[in-house]
From Swiss-Prot:
UniProt protein name: Sugar fermentation stimulation protein homolog
Gene Ontology terms, MF aspect: DNA binding
Spans through the membrane: none
Gene3D superfamilies noted in UniProt: 2.40.50.580, 3.40.1350.60
HAMAP family recorded: SfsA
Family statement: Belongs to the SfsA family.
A Pfam family assignment: SfsA_N
Organism: Pyrobaculum arsenaticum (strain DSM 13514 / JCM 11321 / PZ6)
InterPro entries: SfsA, SfsA_C, SfsA_N
């Protein structure tokens, strides 16, 4: 079962990152600006000389849109704009949350929004926050790869949602081939990790699924075990 992806129309070599959303790459023998649609640091992926996949971009300040990084043994999706679509596809395909349906995308809750509102088989409501994971160390997928105050707030809001009668979940989409489990990145962002643990203790479900990228799409591999235990 595959989530279809647009095939890249350009390949190149990454040179350097300019800021959070832009970088320089060599494509077709010349240096060009590329748009990076991922707020993470991506230091383990975007290093000088790494092979990249991209699509030509019409309009805007950059010529190309980064879609993936090609490592020795894997392709890694680097496009957070697809995360919600992938999560909705997993639900609608019956791969996860069997019997649930997507009732709404980007539902409002409190002062913000979550990614998905699901309807359960019994008519209940379930809020889902989706996070993409591209960092892997020692076969563990780790999130985040940079401090995220916004992510911590999301966990607090999910906990509040359970108190108001919702089911609530955080779904981590893992895009690393070698990952065999998922853990919060305590060393990078202890505040987020603690907020995730508190949310789980308040009844928020924490799930992680692995997806493998190919040129034509993403393949669902399976669900990963989740370990929220502090390493100290």
């Amino acid at each position: 079962m595959y989530f279809p992806l647009e095939e890249p129309d350009a390949y190149g070599d990454f040179v350097r990152r300019l800021n959070r959303f832009a970088g320089i790459a060599v494509i077709g023998g010349r240096e060009v600006k590329i748009h990076i649609h991922d707020p993470g640091r991506l230091q383990e992926l975007l290093f000088p000389g790494v092979k990249i996949w991209a699509r030509r971009r019409v309009g805007g300040k950059t010529e190309y849109y980064l879609t993936a990084v090609e490592l020795e043994e894997e392709l890694v999706l680097v496009d957070s704009s697809l995360h919600n679509k992938v999560a909705a596809w997993l639900v609608e395909s019956g791969v996860i949350f069997q019997g649930y349906r997507v009732a709404k995308k980007e539902p409002a809750f409190g002062k913000g929004r979550f990614d998905l509102l699901l309807e359960s088989p019994t008519g209940g409501r379930a809020l889902v926050e989706v996070k993409g994971v591209t960092l892997e160390a020692g076969r563990r997928a780790l999130f985040p790869d940079a401090p995220t105050a916004r992510g911590a707030r999301h966990m607090e809001e999910l906990a509040r949602a359970t108190a108001e009668g919702y089911e609530a979940y955080v779904l981590f989409l893992v895009f690393r081939k070698r990952a065999a489990s998922f853990s919060p990145n305590w060393d990078m962002d202890r505040k987020f990790a603690e907020s995730l643990l508190r949310a789980h203790n308040a009844g928020v479900g924490v799930r992680a699924v692995k997806l493998e990228m190919f040129k034509w799409g993403l393949r669902y591999v399976g669900e990963l075990p989740v370990d929220l235990t502090p390493p100290f």
